[in-house]
Amino acid sequence: MVDRRTLLLRIVQAFSATGALFLAYPFVKAWLPTFNQQHTLEVDLSDLKIGEIKQVSWLGRNVMIVRRTPEEISGLAEDKHELKDASSVHSRQPALAANQYRSLRPDVFVVYSNCTHLGCEVSASGTAASFNCPCHLSEFDAAGRVYKSAVAPVNLEVPDYQFMSRKILLLVKRA
């Protein structure tokens, strides 16, 4: 038989454990990854014509997908002396973008549309041959590489992605 003192002790322990669980729940929930948030996005490129830009929202950020013209592709090899980081050594990008095009395919360029200075939304300047930041007038070439005269410290950030087919692009968030 359990005496009164032991019974009260067990009741207090049970209430304390229950309270600790209720207190810990919000912290544990915040630390666990959100399973309802989609970490991949499939983008159809069949309607993207040469010289056009498609903008999609993914994981709370805007992503620009540019279909480059042959002139823009050939122009990427020129004027490297005007760029801060022409080889993209100091840029945030996956290994797939470690080339002069900063993309898997020379004709399709995928980039976050946030300036690397203060995060303003960059826009294409008439054509996709260059990007401009409206906040501090930083300029980027067709591969998102920043010019030396710009305020932005590094090139535009390239997300991780892969091609599922010639016309389907999959944006992927890797851990």
Predicted segments with their positions:
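N-terminal secretory signal peptides and thylakoid transit peptides that target proteins
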Residues: 1-15
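Helical transmembrane-bundle signal
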Residues: 16-26
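Short cysteine-rich clusters marking metal-coordination/redox-active sites
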Residues: 115, 133
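Short cysteine/histidine-rich zinc-coordinating motifs and their immediately flanking basic loops
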Residues: 125-130, 144-148
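Detector for the c-type heme attachment site
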Residues: 136-138
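Low-complexity, intrinsically disordered Gly/Pro/Thr-rich segments
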Residues: 143-161
